[in-house]
Design a protein with these regions (language model features):
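Active-site hotspot residues in diverse enzymes, especially metal/ion-binding acidic/histidine motifs
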Residues: 1-192
Length: 192
């Protein structure tokens, strides 16, 4: 499931947002400490963000974590819901689990901090709505999922510091998953 973003973003724009995200929490190392930043992000935005670690059975198949918006009294409150097993594995340093959590944090940064939420449509009756888009049916730069995935990649594997690294160096120094590091080398570092 995907939504069309209200603003399209290029890889270079996302890279700048990643630098801003890291700077917001004074992260100067190659390693992005996802679990520490999760706590810092929740503390910094405690009036609109919290996270919840929940039973694995409470999630649909294939969902590891998700950002949920609850609106009460015209006020938005966001919750990063995290599978218990994903949270436990992230605490142990599992790169994939850290990536799942970071991805949801990136959705929050894009939607709440930068205001890049789903594109709003208004029908002839004046009713506003968003459209659920089939995966891969949008140009990447307009996909909210791609934007969050790209931002997560840029935050966890900083391009300028890792562009000349080997797969092993990236995994070791960034604590990202092997799959994420392979994607970076094949699709990001190679094409820049």
């Amino acid at each position: 499931m995907d939504y069309e973003a209200s603003v399209g973003l290029s890889r270079k724009q996302i890279r700048l947002i990643a630098k801003y995200f890291r700077k917001m929490f004074e992260i100067k190392t190659i390693l992005f400490p996802v679990m520490t930043v999760l706590e810092l992000l929740v503390n910094k935005f405690s009036n609109v963000l919290y996270y919840s670690v929940e039973d694995d059975d409470d999630f649909e198949y294939g969902v590891m974590a998700t950002l949920v918006e609850n609106i009460e009294d015209n006020e938005s409150m966001y919750c990063i819901r995290i599978k218990n097993s994903v949270y436990d594995d992230a605490i142990k340093g599992d790169g994939a689990s850290l990536g799942f959590i970071c991805h949801e944090m990136c959705h929050f940064v894009l939607i709440h901090i930068l205001g890049i939420g789903p594109k709003i449509y208004i029908n002839t009756n004046g009713i506003a709505y968003t459209r659920v888009i089939e995966p891969r049916s949008l140009p990447l730069f307009k996909s909210m999922e791609w934007q969050a995935k790209a931002l997560c990649g840029e935050v966890m594997i900083p391009y300028e510091k890792c562009k000349d690294h080997t797969l092993e160096q990236i995994v070791k120094e960034t604590n990202s998953s092997v799959e994420q590091a392979k994607f970076f080398l094949k699709n990001v570092a190679k094409n820049e």
